């Protein structure tokens, strides 16, 4: 049986934040957890499905692979690996522990959370995308508090062991015949208490701040490309590792060129006389103007390829081409002398359309035959 889409499993959109994914996971994991549905095989299968979706969509690398390749990109049988099925004990700790501020790993203490990943949408001109550049980005984020060095405790003091749970992060509560472990209500699962909190971060260990980063954009990027800056996301809780920053690239439409992969396309207007007699015209490229030789009797719509005048691939040394489509432009605002010359020219073609305009002659012959067949 084919797997369901992970976003569908959790009931979130593809643009859902990590927080939204986690919220959906908690709700569904609690609903389908085997301890709440003893003997229910369907609930157990749904629980495993929710667990797997959550593990993929909260891991930035696995999520990127899934978004690009679907289930094939995260299939453990395609690379040797995998979690080997859902661990009910771990998930019980993840879900119910997080609700109270802690889990059961690490001897019962809630592990300080890694910083959240950030996304920055960067819009570039075609010239910037093709040639590459360095960009200064101003990112609003959470950074480690400097006065307390991220500990949350005022300088000169430090967190103390919680007296309620004795540093375990959990306490045992009795409900009828059952003893239930839950996060310590005093320290919220950390196992430590900040008695003298830092004045700047108020015991949080992190503060809001905008930071400026210089990001090198490689030549050849295109809309949809993503640049990962490891460790430049939000600071983690109480010294935990920071998240990553993902720069999402989009390229504005250009007035002259259209891009398709590494090739560029443009339309170049030419005069009637230039198309008939041939000659040279100037063609724009991203490196400046170049001359293009137009053969005699060139028809409108003809495509000319200028090799190596396209875009350098961001993933190799290959360079695309510039494809120029010539479009014959009908002259306008003619004076009487110019019109008279065209009439004289037209008269010289009378009776010679097959010689000078073979396509038109063939077209009208076809129209004539069509009506003859229609009336026969």
From Swiss-Prot:
GO terms for molecular function: ATP binding; heat shock protein binding; unfolded protein binding; zinc ion binding. A zinc finger (CR-type) spans 132-210. Binds 2 Zn(2+) ions per monomer. The keyword Metal-binding applies. It holds the Pfam family DnaJ. The J domain is necessary and sufficient to stimulate DnaK ATPase activity. Zinc center 1 plays an important role in the autonomous, DnaK-independent chaperone activity of DnaJ. Zinc center 2 is essential for interaction with DnaK and for DnaJ activity. Zn(2+) 2 binds at residues 162, 165, 184, 187. One of its GO terms (biological process) is DNA replication. This is Chaperone protein DnaJ. CXXCXGXG motif repeats lie at residues 145-152, 162-169, 184-191, 198-205. It comes from Shewanella piezotolerans (strain WP3 / JCM 13877). Zn(2+) 1 binds at residues 145, 148, 198, 201. The keyword Phosphoprotein does not apply. Residues 5-70 form the J domain. One of its GO terms (cellular component) is cytoplasm. It comes from the Bacteria.
């Amino acid at each position: 049986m084919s797997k369901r889409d992970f976003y569908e499993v959790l009931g979130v959109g593809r643009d859902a934040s990590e927080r939204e994914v986690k919220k959906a996971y908690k709700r569904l994991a609690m609903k389908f957890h085997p301890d709440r549905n003893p003997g229910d095989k369907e609930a157990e299968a749904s629980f495993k499905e929710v667990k797997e979706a959550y593990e993929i969509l909260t891991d930035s690398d696995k999520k990127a692979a899934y978004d690009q390749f679907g289930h094939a990109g995260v299939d453990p049988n395609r690379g040797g690996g995998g979690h080997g099925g859902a661990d009910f004990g771990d998930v019980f700790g993840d879900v119910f522990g997080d609700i109270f501020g802690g889990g059961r790993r690490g001897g019962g203490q809630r592990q300080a959370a890694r910083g959240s990943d950030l996304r920055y949408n960067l819009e570039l001109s075609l010239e910037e995308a093709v040639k590459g550049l360095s960009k200064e980005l101003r990112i609003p984020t959470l950074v480690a508090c400097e006065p307390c060095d991220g500990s949350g405790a005022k300088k000169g003091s430090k967190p103390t062991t919680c007296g309620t749970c004795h540093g375990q992060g959990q306490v045992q509560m009795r409900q009828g015949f059952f003893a239930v472990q839950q996060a310590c209500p005093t320290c919220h699962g950390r196992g430590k208490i900040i008695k003298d909190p830092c004045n700047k971060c108020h015991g949080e260990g992190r503060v809001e701040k905008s930071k400026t980063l210089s990001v090198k954009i490689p030549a050849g990027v295109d809309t949809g490309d993503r640049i990962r800056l490891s460790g430049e996301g939000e600071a983690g809780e109480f010294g935990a590792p920071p998240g990553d920053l993902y720069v999402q690239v989009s390229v504005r439409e250009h007035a002259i060129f259209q891009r398709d992969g590494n090739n560029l396309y443009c339309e170049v207007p030419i005069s009637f006389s230039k198309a008939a007699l041939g000659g040279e015209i100037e063609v724009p490229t991203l490196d400046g103007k170049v001359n293009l030789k137009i053969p005699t009797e060139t028809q409108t719509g003809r495509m000319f390829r200028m090799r190596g005048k396209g875009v350098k691939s961001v993933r190799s040394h290959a360079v695309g081409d510039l494809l120029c489509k010539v479009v014959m432009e009908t002259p306008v605002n003619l004076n009487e002398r110019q019109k008279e010359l065209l009439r004289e020219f037209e008269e010289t073609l009378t009776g010679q359309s097959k010689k000078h305009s073979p396509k038109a002659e063939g077209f009208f012959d076809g129209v004539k035959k069509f009506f003859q067949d229609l009336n026969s």
